[in-house]
Curated annotation (Swiss-Prot):
Belongs to the PTH family. Hydrolyzes ribosome-free peptidyl-tRNAs (with 1 or more amino acids incorporated), which drop off the ribosome during protein synthesis, or as a result of ribosome stalling. Catalyzes the release of premature peptidyl moieties from peptidyl-tRNA molecules trapped in stalled 50S ribosomal subunits, and thus maintains levels of free tRNAs and 50S ribosomes. Keywords: Cytoplasm, Hydrolase, RNA-binding, tRNA-binding. The lineage of its organism: Bacteria, Pseudomonadati, Pseudomonadota, Gammaproteobacteria, Enterobacterales. The keyword RNA-binding applies. Disulfide bonds: none annotated. One of its GO terms (cellular component) is cytoplasm. It comes from the Bacteria. It comes from Buchnera aphidicola subsp. Baizongia pistaciae (strain Bp). It is found in: Cytoplasm. Pfam families: Pept_tRNA_hydro. TRNA binds at residues 17, 68, 70, 116. This is Peptidyl-tRNA hydrolase.
Length: 207
């Protein structure tokens, strides 16, 4: 992950969406920024909240778009153009219906798999380019008749939130460790192997 220059946490704007399933990508970015003793600041130029963090002497920009999910690409394009960052140098974090709460995966893909935020990023920045993502599991509604659009905009229950936060903690540890592998090309497989190792040892701290 040595080539990563920007980490993006996809989310919907407006405070009422902060704790919803669709916003778990921003949960990871906020946790990462907090660990760095930094704060995300509103940046109208980038249509989002951004800051710069330093991981093992490597400066990395972080962004949470302040656009609705299906317009995320506009914000990502603004910051990537300003800093001359290419799509393959971006790590995007988002919610994933096909992973249960507590599960998380690194993916190197050029398809959106039905996610509207990723769909827009690809539409704006380039549809045939593979880029790295962290998929944070939110699961699917138990009732098959429950609308997905309503489900992703709802809040996970207490146990689900604990599982999601644990997955986020593990993913952040992989981000740190993979950046530390300066002369090693980290593949999707190697990142997920590292992730599996941490999933067996991550501890949740209750607030």
């Amino acid at each position: 992950m040595k080539e990563i220059k920007l980490i993006v946490g996809l989310a919907n704007p407006i405070k009422k969406y902060n704790d919803t399933r669709h916003n778990v990508g921003s949960w990871l970015v906020n946790s990462l920024v907090t660990q760095q003793n930094k704060k995300l600041k509103k940046n109208n130029k980038f249509l989002g909240y951004s800051t710069e963090i330093n991981i093992l002497s490597k400066n990395i920009h972080v962004l949470v778009p302040d656009t609705f999910m299906n317009l995320s690409g506009i914000s990502v394009l603004a910051i990537s153009n300003f800093y001359n960052i290419k799509l393959h140098e971006i790590l995007v974090v988002h919610d994933e219906l096909d992973l249960k709460p507590g599960n998380v995966k690194f993916r190197l893909r050029s398809s959106h798999n039905g996610h509207n935020g990723i769909r827009n990023v690809l539409a704006v920045l380039g549809t045939n380019i593979k880029f790295l993502r962290i998929q944070i599991g939110i699961g699917r509604p138990i009732n098959s008749g429950y609308k997905i659009s309503k489900f992703v905009l709802s809040k996970p229950n207490v146990s689900e939130k604990l599982l999601i936060n644990r997955a986020i903690l593990c993913a952040i540890r992989v981000i740190y460790d993979s950046i530390n592998q300066r002369n090693v090309i980290m593949t999707e497989s190697s990142l997920n192997s590292m992730l599996d190792h941490y999933m067996n040892s991550c501890v949740i701290h209750h607030n």
